[in-house]
Amino acid sequence: MSVFYPKASKTIVGHKAVREALRDTQTYSSDLQGDSDVRDYRQLPLEVDPPRHHLYRVALAPYFVKPSIELLIPEFRAHTEKLLTDFFKHESLEVGQHLSLPLVMKNLGVIYSRPQDVEEWISWGPDVWTAESEVRDGKVLHRYLDAIYEEALTKSKDDIWSQIAYLEIDGKQISAAEFRGIAGVMLAGGRDTVVKLFTGIMWHFGNKPEDLALLRSNPELIGPAIQEFLRFLTPLPAMNRTVVPESSTSELPDDRYVGISFISGNFDESVFENPFQINFHRGRNPHLSFGFGPHTCLGNHIAEIEAKVFLEALIDSGLTWEVTTEEIRFHQLPYTKIPDYFGALKIART
């Protein structure tokens, strides 16, 4: 989930330093609001510090625990197999638009019991802030959030929005703004990041089919492969913190933002041997793609289970493919071999 902030005055880099900063919420606070050009509310529980952060996290955790998500695997698998079959019926298609995005949205439809919304979510494209034009705008998302909030308050449907609308935090039912903040993260947090993960997997296997063959011969490597793809692709490369909590004062210096570089931790040579190589035999893999500390991603189990189903379906399909077109924006030095954004990726069956 990409969040827009003004430029950071400094950036914390390196695995050890990043982990220490993410633990130190008093010095590096999440009490800030990103995307101020398109929203006027906090994304929750992302943009609030402990102890209130913990209250939101405890209330939301039951929706994301691993046993609950594992019950949905058969539906994830059915969607994955159908989309793969349909995708490879064509000579060459764009992966993000025709495979990764639809699959991620269908999975979210299952998780949230909102299959009726999947086509609308897909229509937003990879970034909801640019759903209607290249200019960032919040109207599309906010129309949807306002509509589902009004619907949820009627308790007419048994879905996740009806439950979220009546959550209590510290003994009080959440407000409309809090609902926006929670639901917005739930729609965005597992959207562009997982789309990038799936697209990156297809890109890698298209360029290195021997790695797909390795997994077919050694399915016990699927778990390590998931963690290695998460590390290498680093779907969310950085986030900001603030050294001046924004709700505590009206005097907010322009240089209050500090960048936290997850990608620097994931390619730290003191932790990962040959970090610029994808290695499914890598043992310990303490990557930072889900963050670290109190704000560790709530949806990490969802992403891992989705990726496991995706890889298992690819392995069982017997398919192989090659990249026919790639328009990729890579990161700046020293990460110039690491995709930042897949503008277009077309593949063809071999």
What residues fall within each predicted segment?
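Cytochrome P450
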Residues: 1-350
